[in-house]
Design a protein with these regions (language model features):
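N-terminal binding-site loop/beta-alpha segment at the start of enzyme catalytic domains
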Residues: 1-78
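Acidic (Asp/Glu)-rich catalytic clusters
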Residues: 10, 69-75, 120-123, 153, ...
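Active-site mouth loops of central-metabolism enzymes
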Residues: 22-34, 96-109, 138
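Short, acidic/polar
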Residues: 30-43, 106-121, 168-177
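Active-site groove signature of glycoside hydrolases
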Residues: 119-138
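Beta/alpha (TIM)-barrel catalytic core signal, keyed to glycine-rich beta->alpha loops juxtaposed to Asp/Glu
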Residues: 134-320
Length: 321
């Protein structure tokens, strides 16, 4: 396992992290808590030190599982990054889970309360990183979310402040970095072989301001692992029913076929490993957070850290306009 500093102010982290959305038990198909915990232990055994979760993943369940493993193995030098802003506590009609429909909530009071609830679930006195969870751009024009992060830092309840960036214009994303460069320590960015917009403007700005980059969706919801085809169907509450519908699958798979030469260069590595290694090869990027529901998936992911760097020019991949 290789390690990098998360920007100029962030902690040192493993270049392959553990994305804990799937183990929350919602939106990714069936999961088993015992297997999920084994996956977390496998990550620790492989040298993973960076674990990314969110309060909304499984309505707190992802954080609960991480807390159980921390109790068993100790916190040590682990970096736990969570997120807040998708309010499942107060909104709408209650479901069987006891929570209502999720709504964005970036009011100062709510974010502070959400951070305190995450601290309690995780069994920690301070959060290593708290990230605003993919807010719409208009929410980021408010003072509330930034005041909340500032206060939580001052109170010692969080060590570092981050932003998981939603899909809006690169120029607007870069402006946020400039505007909040003194507060933001890291950003989480959608970046993979088929989605490379961030290279144009956002990554240079992140380097300029010393803001660390966490690579999210590095395998495009599993598509870049090579295990899906045009006939793939996602069932039930699996979010990929919408994020990888038939039309998107066709488009993405067509782009993947044009990159066959890339995979042939690395015959000893899986498509998933090639995708992951690409994501952490850019100098702006410190850590990638693939999901892993089983120990086997985790071990495959972690092996990508020790691959040679994969640097591509725009014509060689799906650099989007």
């Amino acid at each position: 396992m290789q390690y990098k500093n998360l920007g100029a102010r962030g902690p040192r982290v493993s270049t392959i992290g553990f994305g804990a959305w799937a183990i929350g038990g919602m939106n990714w198909g069936p999961t088993d808590d015992d297997v999920s915990k084994k996956a977390l232990h496998a990550a620790l055994d492989a040298g993973v030190t960076f674990f990314d979760t969110a309060d909304v993943y499984g309505f707190g369940h992802s954080e609960d599982l991480i807390a159980e493993v921390i109790k068993e193995r100790g916190k040590g030098d682990l970096i736990i990054a969570t997120k807040a802003g998708n309010d499942f506590y107060h909104a709408g009609k209650e479901s069987d889970s006891g929570y209502g429909a999720i709504q964005q909530n970036y009011k100062k009071k709510y974010l502070i309360e959400a951070a305190e609830k995450s601290l309690k679930r995780l069994g920690l006195e301070t959060l290593d990183i708290l990230q605003l969870h993919s807010p719409d751009l208009e929410k980021l024009e408010w003072d509330d979310p930034w005041e909340a992060l500032t206060l939580l830092k001052e109170q010692g309840k969080i060590q570092h402040a981050g932003l998981s960036i939603q899909s809006f214009k690169e120029s607007e994303q870069a402006h946020l970095l400039e505007r909040h460069k003194g507060l933001l320590d890291c950003i989480q960015v959608r970046y993979n072989l088929l989605e490379r917009k961030a290279e144009k403007l956002l990554f240079p700005e992140a380097i300029k301001y010393g803001v660390g980059v966490i690579v999210r969706i590095p395998m495009l919801f599993g598509l870049l692992s090579g295990k899906f085809n045009r006939q793939s169907i996602f069932e039930g509450d699996d979010h990929r029913r919408f994020n990888l519908d038939a039309e998107k699958l066709k488009s993405y798979l067509g782009k993947m076929e044009s990159m066959s030469d890339l995979y042939e260069r690395y015959p000893d590595f899986s498509p998933a490993q090639v995708a992951l290694r690409f994501g952490i090869s850019h100098p702006a990027c410190s850590v990638s957070i693939p999901g892993g529901k089983t120990p086997a998936q985790v071990n495959e992911n972690c092996a990508a850290s020790d691959m040679p760097a994969i640097i591509l020019h725009p014509p060689e991949s799906g650099l989007d306009d």
